[in-house]
Every structure is written in C-alpha cells, then in structure tokens.
C-alpha cells in the first residue's frame, strides 16, 4: 500500500517543529485514552509503567522497535483531554514531543509535534512518526497494522525535500 506523508516543518527560535496530524471520529476523551492508558498505548506504541503525572517519569516499552527497548519518558505537561507534553532520552538523543487534541462536532484532530534542534535524521524521524500515528489509527479502527517498510525508505525523499526547503 502506498502511504502519503503529511508531516510539515515549522521554524522556531531553537530549530524546527515537525508537525503531523490525524483525524478521528471520536471524542477527545476517547482519543486521549488511546494516548494515555497503558493497555491502549500497547496496541500502537507500547505499554508503559509507573505513576504518571506532570514532573514524573514513567517507563515506556517501544514494542514495535527491534529488541522492544524500554525508555524513560518524563511527563512535562498534562492537560486532560487536550494536551500532553513529554520528553524522553534514548540512543538517538533528547525527544520533546507534544500531543494536542481539538474536538469539534464529534471529530477530534490530533496534532503531534516534535521539537527538533537539528534537521539531521528528519527523514527517518518523520517516517517513524507517520508509521506510529497510522498504528494509532489502526488500533482504533480495527484495520490491519501497517508495515514499517511502507514508510521507510518510501517516505525518505519527501522528508529530505521538506528539510531542504526549511
């Protein structure tokens, strides 16, 4: 299946924001549960453990990555069911991520943002988040999970061009 990338880059004072969106026919509260309840995050990203809350660190398993590593994720800000901001550090660096939900007439838009200090590796990062957000969609609507090779290297040139124009 051919996937169409939707990521965009916006300049910021410290680099760029990578922004991707998905739309759901569901309430913000229901989509929020898919982002914050361990048994539901396990369906598209991985389970988590710990006592979640602003300023606290939880452990998240990246269940769909090679070797299914666990990583520490710090909850920076949490405004249920509208906004979740987290940071995590792994072998690739420091990740600053935000999930923002906006609901209107029973439809919720998820706006995912990753703050990037550099555009190095944006082709891999962008394709990875396209994959994970489509995993979220599949987990919610019961469609088959996508395969990562539908995203990378397939979306590489899109994100490389995006970075060149940024």
Residue ranges and their predicted role:
Residues 28, 76-81, 101-109:
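A short, structured loop/turn motif at beta-sheet edges
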Residues 23, 42-88, 166:
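Glycine-rich portal/gate segments that line the openings of hydrophobic small-molecule binding cavities
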Residues 8-10, 49, 74, 96-100:
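Short, surface-exposed charged micro-motifs
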Residues 15-17, 87-140:
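Beta-strand/loop substructures that line and gate deep hydrophobic ligand-binding cavities in soluble
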Residues 31, 35, 41, 58-60, ...:
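Hydrophobic pocket/interface hotspot
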Residues 26, 53, 70, 124-127, ...:
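Generic recognition of short, well-ordered alpha-helical interface segments
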Residues 2-3, 116-166:
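A conserved amphipathic terminal alpha-helix motif
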Residues 1-48:
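Hydrophobic ligand-binding cavity/cleft-lining segments
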């Amino acid at each position: 299946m051919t996937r169409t990338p939707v990521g965009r880059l916006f300049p910021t004072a410290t680099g760029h924001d990578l922004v991707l969106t998905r739309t759901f026919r569901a309430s913000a509260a229901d989509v929020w549960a898919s982002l914050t309840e361990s048994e539901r995050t396990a369906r598209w990203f991985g389970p988590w453990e710990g006592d979640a809350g602003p300023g606290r660190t939880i452990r998240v398993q990246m269940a769909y990555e090679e070797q299914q590593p666990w990583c520490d994720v710090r909850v920076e800000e949490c405004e249920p069911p509208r906004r979740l901001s987290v940071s995590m550090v792994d072998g690739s660096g420091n990740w600053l991520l935000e999930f923002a939900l906006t609901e209107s007439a029973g439809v919720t838009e998820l706006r995912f943002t990753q703050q990037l200090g550099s555009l190095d590796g944006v082709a891999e990062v962008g394709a990875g988040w396209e994959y994970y957000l489509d995993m979220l969609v599949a987990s919610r609507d019961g469609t088959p999970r996508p395969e990562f090779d539908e995203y990378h290297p397939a979306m590489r040139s899109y994100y490389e061009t995006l970075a060149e124009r940024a």
